[in-house]
Amino acid sequence: DSXVPEXFDARKXXPN
């Protein structure tokens, strides 16, 4: 997802 830091999944809503 754009603008989302690497390792962060916006779909999960939490850090991966």
From Swiss-Prot:
One of its GO terms (molecular function) is cysteine-type peptidase activity. Keywords: Hydrolase, Protease, Thiol protease. Its EC number is 3.4.22.-. The keyword Disulfide bond does not apply. GO terms for biological process: proteolysis. The keyword Transmembrane does not apply. Involved in the dissociation of the larval fat body on metamorphosis. Belongs to the peptidase C1 family. This is 29 kDa hemocyte proteinase.
